[in-house]
Amino acid sequence: MSDLHHLSIAKLVDGLQNQHFSSVELTDHFLKRINTLDKKVNSFITIDEEGARQAAQQADDRRSAGDNSVLLGLPMAHKDLFCTKGLLTTSGSKILHNFVSPYDATIVSNIREAGAVCLGKLNMDEFAMGSDNESSYYGAVHNPWDLSRVPGGSSGGSAAAVAAGFVPFATGSDTGGSIRQPASFCGLTGIKPTYGRVSRFGMIAYASSLDQAGTFGRSAQDCAYLLQPMAGHDARDATSIKRDVPDYVADLQSAAAQADADKPFSGLRIGVAKEYFGKGLDAEVDANVRAALKQYEELGATIVEVNITDPEITLATYYMLAPAEASSNLSRFDGVRFGYRCEDPKDLADLYTRSRSEGFGVEVQRRILMGTYALSAGYFDAYYTKAQKVRRLILQDFKNAFEKCDVIASPTAPTAAYKLDAALDPVTMYLGDVYTIGVNLAGLPAISMPAGFTESGLPIGLQLIGNHWDDSKLLSTAHIFQQHTDHHTKLSATAQESI
């Protein structure tokens, strides 16, 4: 059973249900890989071996008693901004380095109730602010495809753990591309659901109107399995929408079964915007994404030209609104109630100032300053209010585009994974999100999936964007494509290592 980490979720479910292996055996397999190989990847902040083995034994006991729930006994892990009772929840920051959550986030409790086994908490950019996972207080995460490169961010630990074969799937959060960009860099499938589809209760906030929890897996079907217990209304989250949750796995399987064998995408209109293929797009990314679109076309899809807001305008809007919300959300970390507190403060003002300046990293401080400036009395209308008006125009441009098409396709990121310690200036790093942030501003669902590789073997992602509540359609559109291609089946160098 040395290759259990190569199996899809569907095959792992089948193996557990038919007792080819137990949850304890499966959990031990993944824990052994983590303990042996994660020293060079650094994807985990906390490994909960004792809790995982207890949960695995409980899952096996439930199965022996006749419970055959789909996720029962499957190992997984959470991004470290989801509160997890009894475990460290740090959000990748020094300011929370000793914080043990007294309660579970809604998605954590939902996944636990479904029977999945949490192996621990995953590394991330500090407070989800970053695109390379180098800003974590717990050290940079390394890309399992090439350990000298970044995994993307901010959910870099989640992506790296799945790509390395440490967990079959993982949770992440996406504020401006923090699931999709790491999925692209690590050769995975990652979905950011419609805003309001998944509860944010217990998720440490970066920008509340943009944050959304989602999933990583090797395939769209893998993502669908984990998204199922996560989705749904939660009265504890004011932004959660009360709307029926589809059966994501059944929907994509049904769509695949009903599709024409030769032209499964007959009738599907894929919108392509020239704005997504302009200045700054790497030539190899461009070629692979266009090749994937050609495959969709050969499988029956119709490519139609659409127009969306210039990504540079979208980028400027995002980096006005997101830091403004972060400035407000992170004001609670003051050194008084919980988290890091400086030593021997002279007075209350010194306590606030030193606790925050010592507890927050450089990128977080930068964004707090940007946001505070945008919200200041003299500039509120000139910057924040104007950005909110532009946000409405961005949403309207997407609505206009969806009158002509069913999904919109684009590169996920302008480049493949770049080198660690590249010392990118902040603006260059921010440009890495240029194709993903519009989705968050508009509250739309989007998925990234492998579309090919560079000549040096680095993964390249294709992004599909759906209209509001078309999460299931996106999963099906990705799943059927993956039935006709094999990009998602390729394994990283770390995943191929045996122990």
UniProtKB/Swiss-Prot annotation:
Disulfide bonds: none
Enzyme class: ligase
Molecular function in Gene Ontology: ATP binding; glutaminyl-tRNA synthase (glutamine-hydrolyzing) activity
Function: Allows the formation of correctly charged Gln-tRNA(Gln) through the transamidation of misacylated Glu-tRNA(Gln) in organisms which lack glutaminyl-tRNA synthetase. The reaction takes place in the presence of glutamine and ATP through an activated gamma-phospho-Glu-tRNA(Gln).
PANTHER family listed in its UniProt record: GLUTAMYL-TRNA(GLN) AMIDOTRANSFERASE SUBUNIT A, TRANSAMIDASE
Active site: K79 (charge relay system), S154 (charge relay system), S178 (acyl-ester intermediate)
Catalyzed reactions per annotation: L-glutamyl-tRNA(Gln) + L-glutamine + ATP + H2O = L-glutaminyl-tRNA(Gln) + L-glutamate + ADP + phosphate + H(+)
Family: Belongs to the amidase family. GatA subfamily.
Keywords: ATP-binding, Ligase, Nucleotide-binding, Protein biosynthesis
Record-level GO BP terms: translation
Annotated HAMAP family: GatA (MF_00120)
Cellular component GO terms held in the UniProt record: glutamyl-tRNA(Gln) amidotransferase complex
Species the sequence originates in: Psychrobacter sp. (strain PRwf-1)
One Pfam short name: Amidase
InterPro entries per UniProt: Amidase, Amidase_CS, Amidase_dom, AS_sf, GatA
Official protein name in the record: Glutamyl-tRNA(Gln) amidotransferase subunit A
Keyword Ligase among UniProt keywords: yes
Quaternary assembly: Heterotrimer of A, B and C subunits.
